Amino acid sequence: MRTRFAPSPTGFLHLGGARTALFSWAFARHHQGVFVLRIEDTDVERSTPEAVQAILDSMDWLGMQPDEGPFYQMKRMDRYAEVLAGMLEAGTAYHCYCSPEEVDAMREAARAKGLKPRYDGTWRPEPGKTLPPVPADRKPVIRFRNPIDGATSWNDMVKGPISFDNGELDDLIIARPDGTPTYNFCVVVDDWDMGITHVLRGDDHVNNTPRQINILRALGATLPEYGHVPMILGPDGEKLSKRHGAVNVMEYDAQGYLPEAMVNYLARLGWSHGDDELFTREQLVEWFDTRHLSKSASQWDPKKLNWVNAHYIKGMDDAELAGRVAPRVERRGGKPQAADLPAIMGLLKDRAETLEQLAEDAMLFCGEYQPAPAELAAQHLTETARAALADFAARARDTEWNRAAISALIKAVLADRGLKMPQLGIPLRVAVTGRAQTPAVDAVLELLGKETVLARLQAL
């Protein structure tokens, strides 16, 4: 088995493309096959090196390294020219000298008759047919001589049997007047040369498939199997777009989503394994079967993605999680190396949905101390609270500094002063962290360290 992913580098890798790549990658891995990456960069005006790199970075982040490639179409122009010449010689392609305006007029005339708009075959050679004079000042396009009779059918791996009447398929342009080949032609030659056996792609390509099948047949090539995956919709049921939030895969990296979570969530958009919502990359490969790909569109759900990401954060080893969060802390001006970041992760991760949230919360321990705003201090640092804090500080100097001992000390101060937990817990937080809300106060004090805690209490 040989599958492929063939993006156009005219922008970032979007979520729909990433999911298609994931399905093709998992399909190949499941069958111990080969996953090929091909960059379809023939749109010279819109293709950029930055977009190519963004695609490669996204696939690397998701862990979908190709077995072969990336191959670039712009480096295969000689091969396309060779195949075009062979098709012209074999009569499966021909030169067409119609201007774009003439073709538009043909289509309008067909519409006026209630027919499907199409090229009328003016330059298509037929036995006994006299072709028009060749214009002296016009370069021709090359058209594929599509079969007129019968139908082109295939058993789609996702949608089931699909058939197109050949009479409704006009003769496709496969090379422009400047000689550059078109998308549908390059795809066919690439799939043929690269021995692609299975093509999984978005269902916006369904109408291209009969044309590509007919070109492959004209070349005498073995046909791959095709599967067309429905699109991803936004939460409102409309086609997923920028107005629904981020659609660039790498934006999710920047926002603090784990690649493990992204792979898990993307796979569940249009594929299922029973009722399993959470699974590893290895389980995806083991379980992947095109029979379990959905025929209907999937809906993007940011809340579900957050839930999946939180699951992976919670289950990750504290030291590994610290390694992923540390650069995000540093970007905020924090000093992760000055704190016990793995222990901090252990304290914070159960509440976090993203690495960015973790990094922000970790600044409590790794960032510069910001005293409480005056209004917050006035609300919580009352005379009663300050007396209790002074008592706590005095006793703390001789207390072993671990969570259990700190908890016991807090309880002792509460008992001796007849206070309830919020009457000391909140003032402690405000005085030591500048915030009224933090994780468990005894754990926070332990991680900040005795010296830091006493210094901040002394400064009141």
Swiss-Prot record:
Keywords from the named record: Aminoacyl-tRNA synthetase, ATP-binding, Cytoplasm, Ligase, Nucleotide-binding, Protein biosynthesis
InterPro entries membership: aa-tRNA-synth_I_cd-bd (IPR045462), aa-tRNA-synth_I_codon-bd_sub2 (IPR020751), aa-tRNA-synth_I_CS (IPR001412), aa_tRNA-synth_I_cd-bd_sf (IPR008925), Glu-tRNA-ligase_bac/mito (IPR004527), Glu/Gln-tRNA-synth (IPR000924), Glu/Gln-tRNA-synth_Ib_cat-dom (IPR020058), GluQ/Sye (IPR049940)
CDD domains per the UniProt record, alphabetical: GluRS_core
Record EC number: 6.1.1.17
Gene Ontology CC annotation, any one: cytosol
Span of the annotated motif 'KMSKS' region: 239-243
Motif 'HIGH' region positions after renumbering to this chain: 7-17
UniProt-listed PROSITE patterns: AA_TRNA_LIGASE_I
Biological processes per GO annotation: glutamyl-tRNA aminoacylation
Main location as per UniProt: cytoplasm
Catalytic activity annotation: tRNA(Glu) + L-glutamate + ATP = L-glutamyl-tRNA(Glu) + AMP + diphosphate
Pfam families, A to Z: Anticodon_2, tRNA-synt_1c
Residues reported to bind ATP: 242
Region (Disordered): 118-138
Molecular function per GO: ATP binding; glutamate-tRNA ligase activity; tRNA binding; zinc ion binding
Composition skew (Basic and acidic residues), residue ranges: 118-127
Top-level EC class: ligase
Location relative to the cell: Cytoplasm
Matches recorded under HAMAP family: Glu_tRNA_synth_type1 (MF_00022)
Similarity section: Belongs to the class-I aminoacyl-tRNA synthetase family. Glutamate--tRNA ligase type 1 subfamily.
Quaternary structure (record): Monomer.
PANTHER family to which the protein is assigned, alphabetical: GLUTAMATE--TRNA LIGASE (PTHR43311), GLUTAMATE--TRNA LIGASE, MITOCHONDRIAL-RELATED (PTHR43311:SF2)
Cited function: Catalyzes the attachment of glutamate to tRNA(Glu) in a two-step reaction: glutamate is first activated by ATP to form Glu-AMP and then transferred to the acceptor end of tRNA(Glu).
The protein's name: Glutamate--tRNA ligase
